[in-house]
């Protein structure tokens, strides 16, 4: 896994560090940057959604278990659960915003 990660970072470093004046080469570099941007956006959003789903599931399970043990605390636990779910969902939305920036407002793409 470390070798694959090192290879991916090395390829990304070459794509980002290369500087040229030839329009054909610059277009090829832009294609690589776009490809890596799509890969990063997809992986980042997928990991964020997976983590958010696991966190939301654990939060709901803990709230249901707490309400089953002490039904009088149900409304208070629900309020706390909704606040926690909003915070978890905010992290996924932040990942979505970063993915959209990487896809549509990429600062590494050189316009000609």
From Swiss-Prot:
Superkingdom of the organism of origin: Bacteria
Gene Ontology cellular-component terms listed: plasma membrane; proton-transporting ATP synthase complex; proton-transporting two-sector ATPase complex, proton-transporting domain
Transmembrane stretches, start-end: 36-56, 81-101
Major location category of this protein: membrane
Residues flagged as site, Reversibly protonated during proton transport: 89
Pfam families registered for this protein in UniProt: ATP-synt_C (PF00137)
Keyword line: ATP synthesis, Cell inner membrane, Cell membrane, CF(0), Hydrogen ion transport, Ion transport, Lipid-binding, Membrane, Transmembrane, Transmembrane helix, Transport
GO MF entries: lipid binding; proton-transporting ATP synthase activity, rotational mechanism
Location relative to the cell: Cell inner membrane
Membrane-topology annotation of the record: Multi-pass membrane protein
Function text: F(1)F(0) ATP synthase produces ATP from ADP in the presence of a proton or sodium gradient. F-type ATPases consist of two structural domains, F(1) containing the extramembraneous catalytic core and F(0) containing the membrane proton channel, linked together by a central stalk and a peripheral stalk. During catalysis, ATP synthesis in the catalytic domain of F(1) is coupled via a rotary mechanism of the central stalk subunits to proton translocation. Key component of the F(0) channel; it plays a direct role in translocation across the membrane. A homomeric c-ring of between 10-14 subunits forms the central stalk rotor element with the F(1) delta and epsilon subunits.
Family, similarity comment: Belongs to the ATPase C chain family.
Subunit organization: F-type ATPases have 2 components, F(1) - the catalytic core - and F(0) - the membrane proton channel. F(1) has five subunits: alpha(3), beta(3), gamma(1), delta(1), epsilon(1). F(0) has three main subunits: a(1), b(2) and c(10-14). The alpha and beta chains form an alternating ring which encloses part of the gamma chain. F(1) is attached to F(0) by a central stalk formed by the gamma and epsilon chains, while a peripheral stalk is formed by the delta and b chains.
Name of the protein in question: ATP synthase subunit c
Native source organism of the sequence: Campylobacter jejuni subsp. doylei (strain ATCC BAA-1458 / RM4099 / 269.97)
